[in-house]
Amino acid sequence: NKEGLLKKAGQEIEIKYILDLRDFPDSPYKDKFVKDFNVILNDPEISVVVEVIGGIKPSYDFVKSSLLAGKSVVTSNKELVAKKGAELLKIAHEKGVNFFFEASVGGGIPIIRPLHQCLSANRIDEIAGILNGTTNFILTKMIRDNMAFDDALKTAQELGYAERNPSADVDGIDACRKICILASLSFGKHVYPDNIHTEGITKITPEDVAYCENFGGSIKLIGWASRQDDGKVAVMVCPAFIHEDSQLAGVNDVFNAIPVSYTHLR
């Protein structure tokens, strides 16, 4: 894998530091661990910082400081990108460095780069997709195996798909952060999660599942963003009826899917 990375990057990639407050005396990388972020920040040899802490504090301070110091940043921190992305992108642009956050949306589906580059000459009209694998797995178990929500959630936790505290997933918070990131990129207006109507799947019952099946469809948690005629952007996250003919109907288990509707501009 090292040779493959070297070929793609064009230069050798070396991990010089690992920031962690804990001690790892038995780790083969023990010489790389540091507890003071300033060691990384003040080292002129460091050109890229990878943030994997999560949340806003202290991630925001570390990422902002890195960008201001002329270091590119890579992150999968969806909360950080959703709430502070516009500011951090502005700093990165001013400093001539990169702020990469492809992994923050869609479980690694390559959606951010296509929106930013491949579809940049088109007008994005709507995004409506399955953005959270945990809730999609739970709904799949409720549909296929006739499970109640609590039983499906327990199964997801046992398999490692859901956290011990699953609120961010089942309450739609994770999907909300992701659709805000996509909407901000697509429509050029920063969309804040606190302003978005967000409803999770905790109230879905087996009766709801059966009702949808009777009408030839199923329930999916959908993140939706659309450009309105007046120029405003409408965004929401909620369970939705998906007809069996829809592409999204066949997306099950922990998988994500993000259809994008656009207008080709001449």
Residue ranges with predicted function:
Residues K35, P44, K83, G106, ...:
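Conserved active-site and cofactor/substrate-binding residues in soluble primary-metabolism enzymes
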Residues K78-F99:
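Rossmann-fold NAD(P)-binding glycine/threonine-rich loop
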Residues G96, F100-A162, I173-D174:
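Rossmann-like NAD(P)H-binding beta-loop-alpha module
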Residues L153-G250, F255-A257:
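Substrate-binding/catalytic subdomain of NAD(P)-dependent oxidoreductase enzymes
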